[in-house]
UniProtKB/Swiss-Prot annotation:
Source species of the chain: Tupiella akineta (Green alga)
Protein name according to UniProt: Small ribosomal subunit protein uS19c
HAMAP family per the UniProt record, alphabetical: Ribosomal_uS19 (MF_00531)
Cell membrane found in the keyword field: no
Domain of life of the organism encoding this protein: Eukaryota
InterPro entries the UniProt entry points to: Ribosomal_uS19, Ribosomal_uS19_bac-type, Ribosomal_uS19_CS, Ribosomal_uS19_SF
Protein's job: Protein S19 forms a complex with S13 that binds strongly to the 16S ribosomal RNA.
Alphabetical keyword list: Chloroplast, Plastid, Ribonucleoprotein, Ribosomal protein, RNA-binding, rRNA-binding
UniProt record, GO biological process: ribosomal small subunit assembly; translation
Length: 92
């Protein structure tokens, strides 16, 4: 079930305030956030936001094609290192 249109997209208040402050000052700084569930909105375009993946912050430059997606979609939390080539247990 999707979010109601009358509510609007979810953006964490602290993140929204930081983006608006940088827009007012006309500055470009890296914004560090742990809010992976926040939706990218048009006022974020052109900013670099560092998203926490559970271990480190991954910098992400926001473009117009990302609007409507969540920040967490662009910072994967799991790393796949590949299957073991010579695994004798799985052959049994």
């Amino acid at each position: 079930m999707s979010r109601s249109l009358k509510k609007g997209p979810f953006v964490a208040n602290h993140l929204l305030k930081k983006v608006q402050k940088l827009n007012d000052l006309d500055e470009k700084q890296v914004i560090k956030t742990w809010s992976r569930s926040s939706v990218i909105i048009p006022i974020m375009i052109g900013h670099t936001i560092s998203i926490h993946n559970g271990k480190e912050h991954i910098p992400l430059y926001i473009t117009d094609l990302m609007v409507g997606h969540k920040l967490g979609e662009f910072a994967p939390t799991r790393t796949f290192k590949g299957h073991i080539k010579k695994d004798k247990k799985s052959k049994r």
